[in-house]
Amino acid sequence: MPMDPQEARLLDTQLAERLADTRLEAARLDESLAELLRDRADGTADDEHDPEGTPLSAEWSRMAGVREALTRSLHELEAARERLGAGGYGDCARCGRPIGAARLTARPTAELCIDCARRAESRRR
């Protein structure tokens, strides 16, 4: 069933807000990563043997992992808005059935219905 235009506008606004928040978070993290890179470039920093704190390399790895997750979130949010604009939001990308309101409420960027998501997850294991 097609989505009500008012509901679609509300959802698009919510997705746009999440996208803006995620972009802002990614920009802040990029600034922190750049600062950490400058710290790592400082040849006098021997933090690997400092018992007081986290080594720069460990912090870099952690932050890079967070940035990777933010990048995935950005792509998922952009794709959800594209599906919404094209009229395919809420339809499973694999089987075409409706995704289900509860799943979309919990995960607005979901591309797969719960059955297809479970099958995809079991194949990855």
Language-model regions, residue ranges each:
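Interaction interfaces in information-processing and related assembly proteins
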Residues: 1-86, 124-125
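Residues immediately within or flanking Cys/His clusters that coordinate Zn2+
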Residues: 89-90, 110
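Cys/His-rich microdomains that often coordinate metals
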Residues: 99, 120
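Cysteine-rich micro-motifs
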Residues: 109-119
